[in-house]
Design a protein with these regions (language model features):
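Catalytic-loop motifs flanking and including active-site residues across diverse enzymes
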Residues: 47
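Conserved short "hinge" loops at termini or chain/domain junctions
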Residues: 1-44, 58-259
Length: 259
């Protein structure tokens, strides 16, 4: 049995994994059917790497100077456990690096952006697994992202409710995807990019175990208020009311009335 035949089931499982976690079924089918699509080679690489991650432990497989070899004769001996683990780590890194490239390109595909898969990646200020590298995580990026994502969402929710507003936070998520950014004026793009970068910095700061920087966040609120024409989502939100208390009126019928 050839190596391809041995890998065939693993490749099918890899495609299912890609559809469930990255592309969605329709986008995967569309890319697979278009030989000219620039993302197709990336998908193929991810599928092969993901398949090998699960196949290598169950195959008599080693990496030789001429490529992969199947241990089935006296000329090739099985690799040590340490070498196999290094091989798996290398392939996993190749897969994760390719996922980063693929997600960058998918953000330009309207079909994907509007899909359930695209919306999953648009739920935070970090729509890619490379956030792990910004946190100093150098390996197992996919797994690392799955651990970080709930923490990111929790931090962003607190920032949204207390400072930025859920409405503006939602649109900042969408800002990173295609059409919305293109529809903004030059001044708006600059302001939104500034706010996005500063918020990402705060989320990363808190992910590192630090408490919220209250003054830092208050300064961002002041930035929004000073550019309120560019952030109408915030102006119309309940969060904005926290920063615009009602004006005191000295009424005679009130208990605290004074002359």
């Amino acid at each position: 049995m050839s190596l391809y035949e041995k890998l065939n089931n693993y490749l099918s499982e890899a495609e299912t994994w890609i559809a469930a976690n990255i592309t969605g079924t329709e986008t995967l089918a569309a890319i697979s059917a278009d030989n000219e699509d620039m993302t197709r080679p990336l998908l193929c690489r991810i599928a092969v790497c993901h398949a090998l991650l699960f196949a290598i432990p169950s195959l008599d497989l080693v990496l030789t100077p001429n490529g992969f070899g199947i241990v089935n004769n006296q000329n090739i001996v099985p690799a040590s456990k340490e070498r196999v683990e290094r091989l798996i780590a290398t392939i996993e890194k190749q897969r994760d690096d390719t996922i980063i490239l693929l997600l960058e390109k998918l953000r330009k595909k309207a079909q994907w952006v509007d899909s359930d898969a695209g919306r999953y990646w648009a739920e935070t200020l970090f729509p890619n697994i490379d956030v792990c590298e910004r946190m100093g995580i150098k390996e197992h990026l996919w797994d690392g992202y799955q651990r970080l994502r709930p923490q990111i969402i929790a931090i962003e929710t607190l920032i949204a409710n207390g400072f930025i507003s859920p409405e503006l936070m939602h649109d900042l998520h969408d800002y990173q995807f295609g059409d919305m950014c293109n529809s903004l004026s030059a001044d708006a793009k600059s302001a939104w990019a500034y706010l996005l970068t500063r918020l990402q910095s705060e989320v990363l700061y808190q992910l590192g175990g630090q408490p919220p920087r209250q003054q830092y966040l208050a300064d961002l609120v002041n930035f929004i208020r000073n550019n309120i024409g560019l952030f109408q989502q915030w102006a119309e939100s309940d969060t904005a009311k926290l920063y615009t208390p009602p004006v005191f009126v000295n009424k005679k019928e009130a208990q605290g009335y004074f002359f």
